Every structure is written in C-alpha cells, then in structure tokens.
Amino acid sequence: MHHVLYGLAANVALPPELVDRLIAVADAATAGVLAGRDDLTHEQAVALVARDPDTAQQLAHAGLLTAADIDPATHPDAALTLLDRRAGDPEWARLLVRDPLVRNRQSLAACAGLPPDVMETLAADPDVRVVAELAFWTTPDRAAALARHPHAEVRRSVAANEAAPPAVLAALLTGEGLPPARWCLVCDREDTPFVHPRECPRPDCDLLPGESCDGSHDSTVHGTRQQALRNPATPTHAVVGFAGHPSTPLRWDLAARPDLPREVSARLAADPSPRVRADLAENPAIGATLIRAMADDPDHDVRRRLARNPHVPLDVLARLAGTTRIGSALLPRVAAATPHEVGEWARSADPEVRTLLAQRRDLPAEIRDALAADPDAKVVKSVAPHPGLSDGRLRAMVGRHGVRVLAAVAANPDATPALLADLTRHRPPVQKALRAVARHPRATAPALLACLADRDAGPLAAGHPALPPPVIAELLTDTDPRRAEAAAANPSLPPAVMSELLAVL
C-alpha cells in the first residue's frame, strides 16, 4: 500500500481536499513526496511540517514557508535555507553561529548576505571546516585575509572562490608572498610523515585516500593549486608555468583553461599524458592549426574529445568521423554548421558524416527526407526522431531497416497513434521501442496496453494519461509495485478512486 500512497502523493490531479487528507495521514516517505508538489498552498505546507518536521527544509527551499513559520531552534535546516534565500530573520544568523552542531555552522557560512559580525565570528570558528566553508563563499576582502590563514585547508577553499582577488589566487598558486601554512587536516590528527592508505580500516576516518603530509602539507598544497588552476579568476600569467609541472593532475586542470596562450597550448598538445591532451583537445581556446595537428593523435579519447570542440573545422571532423567512435550526441560544430555546410555534408559519400549531420533536428525538409531514405541504417536511425517526417516515411524506414531503427522511429514526436501501436506488435518485441512508445505523448490505449507486460515499459505505460481509467484502477493492485505506484500517480485516475484509496487508511 505504501507505494500506492507515494504515487498518489505525486499525482498532479489529486484534488486539494484529498491533498489535505493525505497530509493528515502521511508517513515520512509520503510526506517527502508531498513536499515536492507544485500546487501546495502555504497552509498545506505548514500542515505538512506539523505532520513531518523533516519536510521543513524542502518546503522552505520551494518558497512555501516564511520566516514567521520557522523556529530556528527546532528547524535549523529550514532557517538556514531561508537565510540563504535572504528571506530569513538576520537575528537567526546570530543564533546559529553559536550552534553546537558543526554542520549547521558550516551551512551558515555558505549563506549569502550575512551580517559582518556573524562573518567575523565564523572566520574565528574553532572548527577549521567552518572557516574553510566561509572561505569558499566569502567576499573579496575577507577572502584575501583568509588566504593567509595558518591552516592549509582554509587556503584551499580560498583558491576555489571565484570572488577572491586575482593577485591572491596567484599567490596561492605559486606560494609567493604568503607565510607558510602551519597545519592541514592530515597533520591535525596524524604524526608526520603520513600517507593515508587507499583502504582505511577506521570507520570514523574522513581523510581521502592518498592524502598526505610530510610536514609541508603536500597533498593540501597540491589541492590548493588544483583549485586555483580551475578558478577562472586566477590570472593567466600565474598559470602558464605549470605546463611543465611534474604533476599530471595539475596539467589536466591547466589544459582545460579557456585563456591558454598559443605556446602553452602547443606544449600541452605534446604532453605525454593522453588525459592532458584530451582535455586540451576539447578546449575552445585552441586554434585551427593545433586542432588539425591533434587530429592525428594516436589516442582514441583525444580524437573523440577533439570532435566535440566547437571550433573543429568540418573537414577535420569528417576525417575524425571515419577513425573515431564519436557517439550519437549532436556535436557543437555540427549544430553550428551553415546552410551551405549542411548541404555539403548531406551529399557526403561517408555514411559516418551523414550520421553526424542527421542528429540535427532543424534540417531543411528536403535534406531531412533524403537522409530518411538513406541506404545506411545508422543514418536512418540518427534522423528518425527528426520532427516533420511523415507517417509514410517513418513506416518505410521500419520496412527497410527493421529492428535497427524501431526505437528511434518510436521516439519521433510526429509518430501517429496507429504507427505506435504497430511498433508494439513487432516480433520479437524491441524493449527500447516499447519504452519509447510508453513515453510518447501521442500513444493511445492499444499501444499502451501492449507495453504494460514489459518489465521496464510497463511502469511508464501505467503512468500514461491515455491509459483507460478502469485499467489504471486495476493496476493499483498489480504485483509489480512500480506499475502500481505509476498508476496511482496517473492524472487520469478517477477522483472517486483516489478518495476510496484514502478512505481505507
């Protein structure tokens, strides 16, 4: 019965009076589902919190609770959510900054618009995790001050703060101009030198695998450099020297930056690490000359990532299509192709090129229809979900290529109800096609009834509003709890049946 209640709680057609009745009897799981409804009134939200206090934070985040509804002493999570939305009472911050739970003070440190005195208190918190959280979110001036904090973990958080001044980020990256850190999370609790094992036997240990300290807080310093390299506010002149750094992860992060000078990009293109070259290959900052050179990279992932670069020349992309498993997603450069380029690719002799083009969903009708009649099944599968294809063309695609294109045809938004029903009658059944039919907004009862027996398509069909109401009601007692829950969530479930379900509770 519980799964039926979960479905009912999510049903968008549940009348307001039945929402009230369900709130009154909801267990914790059902209350959580109810809290996610888009149609809750303020009064219902207050009643739901009274029924299950754990929903307060979710409801506050949804804007359904006000400061008048919340006591920060009993609902600190909800109070913190309202503070972060700048909808809470500022005095709450002065109360919560003294909260004995570290996680609550950490959450407070992440809130926007805190009073200055609260930020001062957080910056001096006895638990470094609170100070580090503040450092990640705080203002430029306070970030500059916290960059000199004696604990390396705080400095690492400053390095990730995009509001930190560029000069401060440069200093954190290079270490120049800052006093040495005195502590890190490793030497806080372990005698040094220490390297945390990959498989730690202590259940209460929260150090990450491989974290280490030899007295120089080496793993935290390395992490600080990683954060600074990832931070777009770190100035270019500070990062370029890391192109030859012995740490491969640092070169990974450098290779993804959008501000790389040409000579640094060229050096990274010859990096011994394929991961570095792959991150560089997808970087929109590299020019056409380097892209052409990298197209011959021996590593498959480098070439695959290069194909996703939005500035890859189409002739290079065509070459990559024949040598690299690129995948089925629409590539940025293909999406940006001009009408002239689209026409050239449609006439390409290479089916891989035509397949990439067929992923677009805005093709001219004559090109779309030509691709739908392509002799290569991969091209047809790629274009099959394109809007505007006629029923006759979709049926012809199935007739020529069968199971290879069935699911793609079923996903076409213009597929007719009759075609969808015919697709479900294919033998042997194509499960992916059944799932596509069960999701399709144009599916009607004959198609949906055929989908119900399938393990994965069945729950989708049970929740489809075109399913006949008597069938939906019957599914409420189905042995598969997923189908029963989906049926309870079906907006076509008659209100009288909804009321009967609640009457037996």
Question: How should these model regions be labeled?
Answer:
Residues M1-L505:
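Alpha-helical scaffold segments
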